[in-house]
């Protein structure tokens, strides 16, 4: 598929709604020929959040995306399942103090960390998730374990295994299944604590004093950009392995100063992530991971909407229309001034390899895209043949309005795959 270029041209794509203006951005096509030798193949695309990423921290965001890609590819090359690889990428993202997931997550109103995470397997369609989880360093590890335990079948006495646990119940289940706990204080960083104190002061001031709304709004926006506290940086990843199986995962610390017990899109089915292998009614395997304002993503079930849209012939156009019509212009968000979110998507299909006449190999065509309505989104991607991951911070062009405009970029990767 040939996609158009024009990153900073400012030329607009035709809007499908009076509420949405779409910004045309560069889409690079990458052609990667991957030989199947001793190491297995695969591809990973990760994101470190949609929101606002300051130039001063761009290096850190790109670095953690690069490490996450490398961890996933190491798993894929060793023959691991797509779910294992996507979980490995998320653990790396959660361990970074610069992301709002795991260590360094946003603090809630009580100054505590409560995390959400989920993972979905495109082959079995099984799903695992945790919400408002405290005391566990890597929430995605609990979600992954829930998925794996669920695939084993029913529990004793015919009980249905859980796929989604929250709060204290999720914590106890994790510890009972050998996942180590950690003191909550070890997950708080000086950055997250400073942001909490700063945001708490703003909240207390707003509650005590009636002030000019415009002036307050400008002050908040300025502070957010200076301190990078305006990011809605849920992290996520999508993976396809050498057999063509896909998986997706997402993890988040949630909104700053959220109410204790609040669960966002990162834990909810069809909202935070989605993965589905090709089937009788699906010509493409698809995987999606979202980021942004959790309430906006929940009310639009954006991950599943994007996955279904990607069954259309033109993935680029299908994703653009979904972001415009199903997100920005969604009737479920009609009262919102600006709709903030981002997605990474991957779709794959098998086709005959022109360079290899062997009957036991096919080319796995992988199309990958990212799109956002926020000011920026940080992504990284890598195939099993690549020596290192590529990273990029996508930004809306000058003049585009966050919450009302759409940026979209992506590429294509070709992998050699064994025939099932």
Swiss-Prot record:
GO cellular component: cytosol
Consequences of knocking out this gene: Tasp1-null mice are born with no apparent respiratory distress, but the majority dies at postpartum day 1 or 2 with no obvious milk spots, suggesting a feeding defect. Newborns are smaller in size compared to their wild-type littermates. This phenotype appears in utero. Animals that survive the newborn period are markedly smaller through adulthood, and display skeletal abnormalities.
Catalytic site: 234 (nucleophile)
GO biological process: positive regulation of DNA-templated transcription; proteolysis
Record's keyword annotation contains Nucleotide-binding: no
Keywords: Hydrolase, Protease, Threonine protease, Zymogen
Disordered: annotated span: 1-25
Cross-referenced CDD domains: Taspase1_like
Short name of one Pfam family: Asparaginase_2
EC number: 3.4.25.-
An example Gene Ontology molecular-function term: threonine-type endopeptidase activity
Task of the protein: Protease responsible for KMT2A/MLL1 and KMT2D/MLL2 processing and activation. Through substrate activation, it controls the expression of HOXA genes, and the expression of key cell cycle regulators including CCNA1, CCNB1, CCNE1 and CDKN2A.
Family membership noted in the UniProt record: Belongs to the Ntn-hydrolase family.
Subunit structure: Intramolecular proteolysis generates 2 subunits, alpha and beta, which reassemble through a non-covalent association to form the fully active enzyme.
PANTHER family for the chain: L-ASPARAGINASE, THREONINE ASPARTASE 1
Protein's UniProt name: Threonine aspartase 1
Gene it is expressed from: Tasp1
């Amino acid at each position: 598929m040939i996609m158009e270029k024009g990153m900073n041209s400012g030329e607009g794509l035709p809007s499908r709604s009076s509420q949405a203006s779409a910004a045309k951005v560069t889409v690079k096509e990458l052609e990667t020929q991957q030989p199947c030798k001793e190491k297995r193949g695969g591809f990973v695309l990760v994101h470190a959040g949609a929101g606002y990423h300051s130039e001063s921290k761009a290096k850190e965001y790109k670095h953690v995306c690069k490490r996450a890609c490398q961890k996933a590819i190491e798993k894929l090359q060793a023959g691991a399942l797509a779910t294992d690889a996507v979980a490995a990428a998320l653990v790396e993202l959660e361990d970074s103090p610069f992301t709002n997931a795991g260590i360094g997550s946003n603090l809630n109103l009580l100054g505590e960390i409560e995390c959400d995470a989920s993972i979905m397997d495109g082959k079995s369609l099984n799903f695992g998730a945790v919400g408002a989880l405290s005391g566990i360093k890597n929430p995605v590890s609990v979600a992954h374990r829930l998925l794996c335990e669920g695939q084993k079948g029913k529990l004793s006495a015919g009980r249905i295994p859980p796929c989604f646990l929250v709060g204290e119940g999720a914590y106890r289940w994790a510890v009972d299944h050998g996942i180590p706990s950690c003191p909550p204080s070890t997950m708080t960083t000086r950055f997250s604590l400073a942001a909490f104190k700063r945001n708490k002061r703003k909240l207390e001031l707003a509650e005590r004093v009636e002030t000019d709304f415009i002036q307050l709004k400008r002050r908040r926006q300025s502070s957010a950009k200076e301190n990078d506290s305006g990011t809605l940086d849920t992290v996520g990843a999508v993976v396809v392995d050498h057999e063509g199986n896909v998986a997706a995962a997402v993890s988040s610390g949630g909104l700053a100063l959220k109410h204790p017990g609040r669960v966002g899109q990162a834990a909810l089915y069809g909202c935070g992530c989605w993965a589905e292998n090709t089937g009788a009614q699906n010509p493409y395997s698809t995987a999606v991971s979202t980021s942004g304002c959790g309430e906006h993503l929940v009310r639009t079930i954006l991950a599943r909407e994007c996955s279904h849209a990607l069954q259309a012939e033109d993935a680029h156009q299908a994703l653009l229309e979904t972001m415009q019509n199903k997100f920005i212009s969604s009737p479920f968000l009609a009262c919102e001034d600006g709709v903030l979110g981002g997605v990474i998507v991957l779709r794959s299909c098998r086709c005959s390899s022109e360079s290899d006449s062997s009957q036991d190999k096919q080319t796995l065509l992988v199309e990958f895209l990212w799109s956002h309505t926020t000011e920026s989104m940080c992504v990284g991607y890598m195939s099993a043949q690549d020596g290192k991951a590529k990273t990029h911070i996508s930004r809306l062009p000058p003049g585009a309005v966050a919450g009302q405009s759409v940026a979209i970029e992506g590429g294509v990767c070709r992998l050699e795959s064994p025939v099932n």
